Amino acid sequence: MLGPGDHVVASPAVYEQVLEDAGVLSAERRREAILAGIAEVEAARPGCHVDTPKKVFEEVINLCEWPTVLVGTFDEEFLKVPHEIICESMLTNQRYFPIYDGEGKLTREFVVVSNSKPENAERVIDGNERVVRARLDDAKFFYEEDLKISLDEFRERLAKVAFQEKLGSVLAKSERIEQLALAIAREAHLGAHLAADAARAAHLCKADLVSNAVVEFTSQQGVMGGYYATAMGENDEVAHAIRDHYRPRFAGDELPEGTAGCIVACADKLDTIAGIFAIGEPPTGSSDPYALRRAAIGIINILRDRLPIDPTSLIDFALELYSEQGIEFDAAEVAQQVRDFFHGRLVSMARDEKIPADTVAAVSAVHIIAPSVFFARCAALDEARKNDVETFDNLATAYARAAHISKPELGAEYDRSLMGEAELALADASEAAQTAVDAALAAEDYPAAFAALAAMRAPIDRFFDEVMVMDEDEQLRDNRLKLLNRFEAVFSGIANIGELARKK
């Protein structure tokens, strides 16, 4: 474009130089030129920042041959429009980079990367300002028109918007989310005021899907609803919950700001997971068209960091709401599938966090799906093992040995009158450990729980050293097996220590 005509490349060695002489920089040189230009823009405006989203930035690099960084402006009136749709319009439609001031507020200026000679800068800037003005006029119009309609009225229109072919409308989904939000608030023992805020936010959270702004700028769903909620007079907790309820949208994304937002986000995601499983379309292999894995990970992150509750009963309730809607499925079977799905995500996340595989397996074996409990137990067991490797290695071996020969059908009611000293010592240690473990679990003191388990190492070692479990006397043999069942039972609510004895 800047170097018309033919340009002969005599050899591979001169290829890039010929391109440069013809007005075409290499990709790396284009990147450097744009970054240098942006740095100059920021240096001339102390405290300001040019927003360059990676995807758009890479597109710009590949759309120009000889980049020139210029700065344009738009009218002050457009700053009254939510900055999210202003920026999306500039970035998506024109690939202009917005400039923010030192306080993080959008300014009237934006960066244009032009593919023309610097001497044409004034004309290029004028043309781009006219283009952006037209785009922002549209965004302003959509926003102002939306403000004329209440979110409740928008919500009524959701009856004509399908959520999923077999699962009904988005209006029906919003009704389920509202009920789930109240159930989550109860499960988390939150106050009536916060529960009411969560329910109100859930009631309105999908309303903006039919607004003009979101129809035009689909990635701003939720965000625009938050603005409209504020304009309607909803309190900040409700407005922010509507704004944030799609979070986290991807790995590393922020969690919702407020508690109500966390509740609505979990309710929305859980409703989707429950519904898709209910119609028999769960993720398979690499196929996950409804992004259920991402939704489950989002729920897990929220429950782990912000709402330390067990989702088990909530899964049942989410499925119950679909059943009441007339969706037919085996509730018990699907509930188990959803629990297993969450469990699988927990295990995957733990491994991604480099928690030892056998530690994860030990905690996973007791089928905990409360994220805060699962990760706390993994951390406590891992720390206990590091602090006393020999004790836990030996305890794991003894547990695995006991599990190998045990007969669960015999129960755990043993007869002390048939026991020798080693057996009595193990019986006493098991009962003491059970009491200590129960108290520790009630207090969510997982290090104390694993310390109580570790205290059984010496008694179980002595038992296997001194006692012939499989005695010829059936009465003695069964009593000893019952004692081993009792020993195993102490572990049943916290971790399967035998997993630590498996070869890696």
Predicted regions mapped to residue ranges:
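Amphipathic alpha-helical "coupling" segments that flank catalytic cores
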Residues: M1-K504
